């Protein structure tokens, strides 16, 4: 290759090979000039190795140079998936997540909107701490694929984090329930939201009963069941279960359980 380079130093392919070989033989100081020259000679052909090598460095200036070059190539090849994918990775590398989201729009125009797109949009919005947009993206995908369990979980986690209204929580928990019927946390939380929202107390009782049968010393589950009994007007049973909840309470749950305990005592006039 060196012989070929000596004969034709302005051949893009030879320059690219020189860079690749020096990289393979761990001579980094010699790699960049050849890859750069190959790119300069034929940017639409030899952009990949040059950009990848620039992005491997921790030097932000080199990463920004890669972005500049990739933007140029992307303009000349607006429908090339590989270019835009690497360009998006480059923006993520320099922590320009808003620009990475804009590149996702271009990728969607090439590949169509799909699970990978929705996942990327969800992740980027979460990195940007834009939970509202993250929720919107998850809900958008679930409109097309309502049975996607992973996105149902994402939605539920986001709803919990942002304290969404009970009707939205009930919808999210109910959608996931058929896929995870033995997830006691899910059953308990659905029962709780049905209870506090004035929903189906019969269903809430059934769900909550299942959890305390599975984990009879779980103070949170016992408290939920006691509060369902309270809302049904069954104060004797409510008192029995709230006492058990207090017996097994941990510091993180004790305060709310004590609040419910006082409310039940008031109804019993004790």
Residue ranges, per PLM feature:
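Canonical positions in the second alpha-helix
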Residues: 3-4, 37-38, 72-73, 106-107, ...
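Start-of-helix register in tetratricopeptide repeats
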Residues: 13, 45-48, 82, 116-119, ...
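Single-residue signature of alpha-solenoid repeat helices
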Residues: 31, 66, 100, 134, ...
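Canonical tetratricopeptide repeat
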Residues: 17, 50-52, 86, 120, ...
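Alpha-helical adaptor scaffolds
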Residues: 153-162, 174, 178-215, 220, ...
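Residue-level recognition of tetratricopeptide repeat
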Residues: 20, 52-55, 89, 123, ...
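Register position in tetratricopeptide repeats
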Residues: 24-25, 54-59, 93, 127-128, ...
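Short coil turns that delineate tetratricopeptide repeat
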Residues: 9, 43, 78, 112-113, ...
């Amino acid at each position: 290759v060196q012989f070929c380079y000596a004969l034709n130093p302005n051949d893009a392919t030879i320059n690219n090979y020189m860079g690749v070989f020096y990289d393979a033989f761990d001579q980094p100081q010699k790699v960049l000039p050849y890859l750069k020259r190959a790119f300069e000679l034929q940017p639409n052909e030899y952009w990949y190795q040059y950009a990848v090598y620039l992005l491997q460095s921790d030097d932000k200036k080199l990463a920004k140079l890669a972005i500049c070059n990739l933007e140029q190539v992307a303009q000349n090849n607006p429908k090339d998936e590989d270019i835009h994918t690497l360009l998006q990775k480059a923006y993520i590398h320099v922590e320009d997540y808003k620009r990475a989201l804009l590149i996702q729009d271009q990728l969607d125009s090439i590949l169509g909107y799909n699970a990978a797109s929705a996942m990327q949009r969800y992740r980027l919005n979460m990195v940007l701490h834009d939970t509202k947009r993250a929720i919107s993206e998850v809900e958008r995908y679930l409109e097309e694929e309502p049975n996607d369990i992973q996105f149902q979980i994402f939605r539920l986690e986001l709803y919990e984090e942002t304290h969404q209204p009970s009707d939205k929580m009930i919808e999210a928990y109910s959608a996931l329930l058929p896929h995870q019927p033995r997830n006691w946390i899910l059953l308990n939380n659905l029962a709780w939201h049905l209870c506090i929202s004035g929903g189906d107390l019969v269903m809430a009782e059934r769900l909550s009963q299942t959890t305390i049968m599975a984990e009879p010393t779980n103070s949170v589950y016992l408290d939920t069941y006691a509060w369902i009994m309270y809302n049904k007007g069954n104060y004797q049973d409510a008192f029995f279960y709230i006492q058990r909840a207090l017996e097994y309470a941990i510091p993180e749950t004790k305060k709310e359980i004590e609040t419910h305990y006082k409310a039940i005592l008031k109804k019993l006039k004790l």
